[in-house]
Curated annotation (Swiss-Prot):
Gene Ontology terms for molecular function: DNA binding; DNA-directed RNA polymerase activity; ribonucleoside binding
Subunit structure: The RNAP catalytic core consists of 2 alpha, 1 beta, 1 beta' and 1 omega subunit. When a sigma factor is associated with the core the holoenzyme is formed, which can initiate transcription.
Enzyme type, top EC level: transferase
Highest taxon above the source species: Bacteria
Reaction equations catalysed: RNA(n) + a ribonucleoside 5'-triphosphate = RNA(n+1) + diphosphate
Role of this protein: DNA-dependent RNA polymerase catalyzes the transcription of DNA into RNA using the four ribonucleoside triphosphates as substrates.
Keywords: DNA-directed RNA polymerase, Nucleotidyltransferase, Transcription, Transferase
GO cellular component term, pick one: DNA-directed RNA polymerase complex
Record InterPro entries: DNA-dir_RNA_pol_bsu_ext_1_sf, DNA-dir_RNA_pol_bsu_external_1, DNA-dir_RNA_pol_su2, DNA-dir_RNAP_su2_dom, DNA-dir_RNAP_su2_hyb_sf, RNA_pol_bsu_bac, RNA_pol_bsu_CS, RNA_pol_bsu_protrusion
Family: Belongs to the RNA polymerase beta chain family.
UniProt-listed PROSITE patterns: RNA_POL_BETA
Organism: Sodalis glossinidius (strain morsitans)
Protein name, as recorded: DNA-directed RNA polymerase subunit beta
EC code(s) of this entry: 2.7.7.6
Length: 1342
């Protein structure tokens, strides 16, 4: 493998054995591709905005005299960029402008004669845009639209599995689900009649819908049944015989023909009998008259003389009717062929319960069911039925629905109309009847071929269409009402309903969620999440066990591990690493094609539907060098089952061992050794890890760390290769390689880094450069690390030296004992940034004012404010400190005559305002790192706002000037090259100013042209700079668009540094979570023979019952990695020769059986080897991919190479006594995470505060400054101790004895420490509740 200069800085040793056939594709593509499809113009009009416009336009007036046509649309440029939107609290969006054409037709002239055409571009609201990282900025906060897994449109055949009816009879049903429109259900009842429901309303006999489609009884029977023909000859009945129909029946008479008795009466007819009948060619047999009695006729039989119907279709024959038929001269009688086995008389039976007789009565019946209480007219009934399933405006199966529909009915073509046809309905009924007859299978609803993904673009398009439909109604009204000659398209369209629909979706839909921004992994996982909840999906309460369960089709598409614990388990899933959606929205996963038992590198993506037809081998199947299967029998999956197949039967093979799991689970090393429940917790807890101040890459990783860090977008990645020309904490400048430059550009890339920004979870986002001046970089190299990344690898926690042993009860029940060294070295110190806002409004009594002049506040409290009343940057504040001074006008109070007199003499007093300043919340302390002031247009800016503005202008000018200088330097370097190659001496050039160079002339015409081009570029650059500066100035100085009634907003940002402390929650990556019980002095920690103490002591009892053995293997491998690092460190300290160093590191990389990674250090320069060694001295990072990790033997070899015992256990000594522990202890390095459940955020203590209104008891919870509930069990505890007075105090004055509380306060003030308990308020509540039940209880007081 070829490594770039940056990648050579630290290479992770990979234990993976299987070759990597397919690289992990961009992890956020599901979001970005979907949204791109939405806003990109699709010439076919199948997707996105184009599809929405085409489906609604043209809009015609009711009279048909005019219409509004859609021509095209374009999206404008967003006003603010992403960062500005976040600061200002606005939505990152672009204006949508649509070109519309209004056509007015001549009224009197023939149809289609155009009178006037007007074309105009109309504004249709704002469309939120997706940022480069797949998020949306809505009102200043980053949100993610989660993809939804919903039932695909199409037709589904299902059964109630015998749960509906008490008899346990299985009732089958079919449901036609459109993409939009009414649902159509067919279902059997326990009596085997077929019913239909529209939109889950009350059921009607299914034949009603056939009658509404203009089928007569005869046609219905003809469509659904085979016929049996009887002929009457001389009072004898002859039946046409199709022997196959007799199979399985019991003969009710002797079956004979040509004098041969084939089946005797009472005998069961078998296949042998049928073969005999067929062989002898028996076409007719004589049957007794009783045999035909009770059979239903196929058509109406009419007396030809009188024209009356003797026997109507579907009537059962009796002897009388038979006689009548014979008299009327009907010699040939056709009846329905039915039996109890596989030809049920369902439709025939249904017709008997059908109250309707013709089309009109059927339409009226459907109208009554859909619109109960409204009088039906023929026209209304026909319209309603037409619009239900046969109108393109109201009903759409969509391409997916039609494809699923046709596949289900086994049709050849998969494309077709979006509305239903007669054939569609009849074929669905036929298939349902076949299933009831025992032919065919019901569908599996949870199969991923029946559930599809609806992503951002599709949901936004649907919402946009909803808005357009609302507008359509208004436009129709206007086209019919207005004076069309003066109207323009602009006057027709009101953009409000459209932007309201879009805004509502992005702002408050259940699937538009506040982005989880704890760390890069939580961001990526949130964007790859798939939810079955949301509009048009399931609800938590209704979702049963089956929907939540892992299904065989989840393999490689949806992760079986990562899902939340709790009520949403199984409803919210995560996309697997390689999964993607196909054009229909179904999930597909890649496989390698197998041909004649040889695995090729050809990759096919298969959806769950396609996968069912193939035999697929596992990724860990043994292959020979030529890619053929080594074993004769191979473990494969086929049709959801796993079994052994011969090598010739295999069609495909998995691409990778980590194909099954999601990104989160693929980061857990030795996942294959963990119990699934714990792996689930591990995957979920990684997302809660807080980014630490000093990041530390995991010693034991899986090789996915780099992909996650880069794809999450928190790092700065080189767009093009080149050399680092300049680097500081806030910007990196790359001089682009000439071969990657566009013609005629300066060839400079500038990367501005993000510094100390608050994330959604109040963690700190900051980027740090990880390249040095003059270094070569290649495209895709990481230039700067973001939060939780280390040299471009994901680093969520810290490598800690841990020991598994009990330690004085401090690790009872998953607690952890942590060494003080961890605190001293700031290993788990995190920075949290809080945003506090102060809003100044215009009240009825006058405007609120932000000022330092606050009534009744001492000097000390104002010491941190400037003259505008806003806190300084850099001030250290604690709970209760004023951040922004604000006063609110008070209502006029009634004044006494004396006060009035004083007022009159001394003028206005400041007592008519009250203090409403922004203060630091209780329990929070930190440093002010930023202040922003937003002022409404037209309101005068205060001094502080002007200062901030001036500072921003200076900064913007400085940044732009520096950028210009960088670009200029690049340009002039190229101009100089051209001039020198054109024959001008370098010394002469250096004497001239750079601007004069452009005036020089060259003899060579080509060179002169180049020079002129560069001169043009220089002018353009300067002009561009002026334009940018002016735009920046305008943005900074313009007023802000604030909510109605708001004059000013001041935002103060506090940075809080949190060190680790007892009560904080920590976890490993294997679901091994715990709380810190004690921070122990270093000298008391257990230490090894070299005197090195451990950092954390974990309880060994936490491992066996939880079955997450992965943590033990990680500990051993971590120890080995550290051992190798220690050896490299020792060699560096002793200044060993580079050759020795190279040899040792090479040995470490080569270790392992048949590993895929090949690192050849001979291709590295000495300097590169030394730099690699410098980065490896703290431990050699190791990758052990999921299901393809390091074997026990390899771990032992690595331990041996590091000079450590292969048992992974060492002798420890007690730090307090110095005595050796009795047994050897497992010690090693485990990657530990600090989770975002910090004791500082949870802990609080109530003094006095608010009380609940009804019970008068203190509220609960930190947010309400509540108390702790003293519950039933706690009362028992005090009763057991006999602490009567303490108990009385708890239940009265400390809780809800209102009078007792006030008395006690008075007593304490008077210095009298007595308490008089009274009546608890909850007793009165109890009395009232009992009274509400009609029992009067009165309290008699002595």
């Amino acid at each position: 493998m070829v490594y770039s200069y940056t990648e050579k800085k630290r290479i992770r040793k990979d234990f993976g054995k299987r070759p990597q056939v397919l690289d992990v594709s961009y992890l956020l593509s599901i979001q970005l591709d979907s949204f791109q499809k939405f806003i990109e113009r699709d010439p076919e009009g199948q997707y996105g905005l184009e599809a929405a416009f085409r489906s609604v336009f043209p809009i015609q007036s009711y009279s048909g005299n005019s219409e509004l046509q859609y021509v095209s649309y374009r999206l404008g440029e967003p006003v603010f960029d992403v960062k500005e939107c976040q600061i200002r609290g606005v939505t990152f969006s672009a204006p949508l402008r649509v070109k519309l054409r209004l056509i007015i037709y001549e009224r009197e002239a023939p149809e289609g004669t155009v009178k006037d055409i007007k074309e105009q571009e109309v504004y249709m609201g704002e469309i939120p845009l997706m940022t480069d990282n797949g998020t949306f900025v809505i009102n200043g906060t980053e949100r993610v639209i989660v993809s939804q897994l919903h039932r695909s449109p199409g037709v589904f055949f299902d059964s109630d599995k015998g749960k509906t009816h008490s008899s346990g009879k299985v009732l089958y049903n079919a449901r036609i689900i459109p993409y939009r429109g009414s649902w159509l259900d067919f279902e059997f009842d326990p009596k085997d009649n077929l019913f239909v429901r529209i939109d889950r309303r009350r059921k009607l006999p299914a034949t009603i819908i056939l009658r509404a489609l203009n089928y007569s009884t005869g046609q219905i029977l003809d469509t659904f049944f085979d016929k049996v023909v009887y002929e009457i000859h001389d009072k004898k009945l002859q039946m046409e015989l199709l022997p196959e129909r007799l199979r399985g029946e019991t003969a009710s008479f002797d079956i004979e023909a040509n004098g041969t008795v084939y089946v005797e009466k009472g005998r069961r007819i078998t296949a042998r009998h049928i073969r005999q009948l067929e062989k002898d060619g028996v076409a007719q047999i004589e049957v007794p008259v009783e045999y035909i009695i009770g059979k239903a006729v196929v058509k109406d039989y009419i007396d030809e003389n009188t024209g009356e119907i003797i026997v109507p279709a579907n009537m059962e024959l009796t002897l009388d009717l038979l006689a009548k038929l014979s008299q009327a001269g009907h010699k040939r009688i056709e009846t329905l062929f039915t039996n109890d086995l596989d030809h049920g008389a369902y439709i025939s039976e249904t017709l008997r319960v059908d109250p309707t007789s013709d089309r009109l009565s059927a339409l009226v019946e459907i109208y009554r069911m859909m619109r109960p209480g409204e009088p039906p007219t023929r026209e209304a009934a026909e319209n309603l039925f037409e619009n239900l399933f046969f109108s393109e405006d109201r009903y759409d199966l969509s391409a997916v629905g039609r494809m699923k529909f046709n596949r289900s009915l086994l049709r050849e073509e998969i494309e077709g109309s979006g509305i239903l046809s007669k054939d569609d309905i009849i074929e669905v009924m036929k298939k349902l009847i076949d299933i009831r007859n025992g032919k065919g299978e019901v569908d599996d609803i949870d199969h991923l071929g029946n559930r599809r993904i609806r992503s951002v673009g599709e949901m936004a398009e649907n919402q946009f269409r909803v808005g357009l439909v609302r507008v359509e109604r208004a436009v129709k009204e206007r086209l019919s009402l207005g004076d069309l000659d003066t109207l323009m398209p602009q006057d027709m369209i009101n953009a409000k309903p459209i932007s309201a629909a879009v805004k509502e979706f992005f702002g408050s839909s259940q699937l538009s969620q506040f982005m989880d921004q704890n760390n890069p992994l939580s961001e990526i996982t949130h964007k790859r999440r798939i939810s079955a909840l949301g509009p048009g999906g399931l609800t938590r309460e209704r979702a049963g066990f089956e929907v939540r369960d892992v299904h065989p089709t989840h393999y490689g598409r949806v992760c079986p591990i990562e899902t939340p614990e709790g009520p949403n388990i199984g409803l919210i899933n995560s996309l697997s690493v390689y999964a993607q959606t196909n054009e229909y929205g179904f999930l597909e996963t890649p496989y390698r094609r197998v041909q004649d038992g040889v695995v090729t590198d050809e990759i096919h993506y298969l959806s769950a539907i396609e996968e069912g037809n193939f035999v697929i081998a596992q990724a860990n199947t043994n292959l020979g060098d030529d890619g053929s299967f080594v074993d004769d029998l191979v473990t494969c999956r086929s049709k959801g089952e796993s079994s052994l197949f011969s090598r010739d039967q295999v069609d495909y093979m998995d691409v990778s061992t980590q194909q099954v799991v999601s990104v989160g689970a693929s980061l857990i090393p030795f996942l294959e050794h963990d119990d699934a429940n714990r792996a689930l917790m591990g995957a979920n807890m990684q997302r809660q890890a807080v980014p630490t101040l000093c990041t530390d890459k995991p010693l034991v990783g899986t090789g996915m760390e780099r992909a996650v860090a880069v794809d999450s977008g928190v790092t700065a990645v080189a767009k093009r290769g080149g050399t680092v020309q300049y680097v500081d904490a806030s910007r990196i400048v790359i001089n682009v390689n000439p071969d990657e430059m566009y013609p005629g550009e300066a060839g400079i890339d500038i990367y501005n880094l993000t510094k100390y920004i608050r994330s959604n979870q109040n963690t700190c986002i900051s980027q740090t450069p990880c390249v040095s001046l003059g270094e070569p970089v290649e495209r895709g190299d990481v230039l700067a690390d973001g939060p939780s990344t280390d040299l471009g690898e994901l680093a969520l926690g810290q490598n800690m030296r841990i020991a598994f042993m009990p330690w004085n009860g401090y690790n009872f029940e998953d607690s952890m004992l942590v060494s003080e060294r961890v605190v001293q070295e700031d290993r788990f110190t995190t920075i949290h940034i809080q945003e506090l806002a102060c809003v100044s409004r215009d009240t009825k009594l006058g405007p609120e004012e932000i000022t330092a002049d606050i009534p009744n506040v001492g000097e000390a409290a104002l010491s941190k404010l400037d003259e505008s009343g806003i806190v300084y940057i850099g001030a250290e504040v604690t709970g209760g400190d004023i951040l922004v001074g604000k006063v609110t006008p008070k209502g006029e109070t009634q004044l006494t005559p004396e006060e009035k007199l004083l007022r009159a003499i001394f003028g206005e007093k400041a007592s008519d305002v009250k203090d409403s300043s922004l203060r630091v919340p209780n329990g929070v302390s930190g440093t002010v790192i930023d202040v922003q002031v937003f002022t409404r247009d037209g309101v005068e800016k205060d001094k502080r706002a002007l200062e901030i503005e001036e500072m921003q202008l200076k900064q913007a000018k400085k940044d732009l000037t520096e950028e210009l200088q960088i670009f200029e330097a690049g340009l002039f370097a190229r101009i100089r090259d051209v001039l020198i190659s054109g024959g001008i001496e370098a010394e002469k050039l250096d004497k001239l100013t750079r601007e004069r160079w452009l005036e020089l002339g060259l003899a060579d015409e080509e060179k002169q042209n180049q020079l002129e081009q560069l001169a043009e570029q220089y002018d353009e650059l300067k002009h561009e700079f002026e334009k940018k500066l002016e735009a920046k100035r305008r943005k900074i100085t313009q007023g802000d668009d604030l909510a109605p009634g708001v004059l000013k907003i001041v935002k103060v940002y506090l940075a809080v540094k949190r060190q680790i402390q007892p009560g904080d929650k920590m976890a490993g990556r294997h679901g091994n979570k715990g709380v810190i019980s004690k921070i122990n002095p270093i000298e008391d920690m257990p230490y090894d023979e070299n005197g090195v103490p451990v950092d954390i002591v974990l309880n060994p009892l936490g491992v066996p019952s939880r079955m997450n053995i992965g943590q033990i293997l990680e500990t051993h491998l971590g120890m080995a990695a550290k051992g190798i690092g220690d050896k490299i460190n020792a060699m560096l300290k002793q200044h060993e020769e580079v050759a020795k160093l190279r040899e040792f590191i090479q040995k470490a990389y080569n270790l392992g059986d048949d590993v895929r990674q090949k690192v050849d250090l001979n291709t590295f320069s000495d300097e590169e080897v030394l730099r690699l060694a410098e980065n490896l001295k703290k431990g050699m990072p190791i990758a052990t991919p999921v299901f393809d990790g390091a074997k026990e033997k390899e771990i032992k070899e690595l331990l041996q190479l590091g000079g450590l015992p292969t048992s992974g256990q060492i002798t420890l000594f007690d730090g307090r006594t110095g005595e050796q522990f009795e047994r050897q202890v497992t010690v090693g390095y485990m990657y530990m995470l600090k989770l975002n459940h910090l004791v500082d955020d949870k802990m609080h203590a109530r003094s006095t505060g608010s009380y609940s209104l009804v019970t008068q008891q203190p509220l609960g919870g930190k947010a309400q400054f509540g108390g702790q509930r003293f519950g039933e069990m706690e009362v028992w505890a005090l009763e057991a101790y006999g602490a009567a007075y303490t108990l009385q105090e708890m239940l009265t004055v400390k809780s809800d004895d209102v009078n007792g509380r006030t008395k006690m306060y008075k007593n304490i003030v008077d210095g009298n420490h007595m308490m008089e308990p009274g009546m608890p308020e909850s007793f009165n509540v109890l009395l009232k509740e009992i009274r509400s039940l009609g029992i009067n209880i009165e309290l008699e007081e002595d």
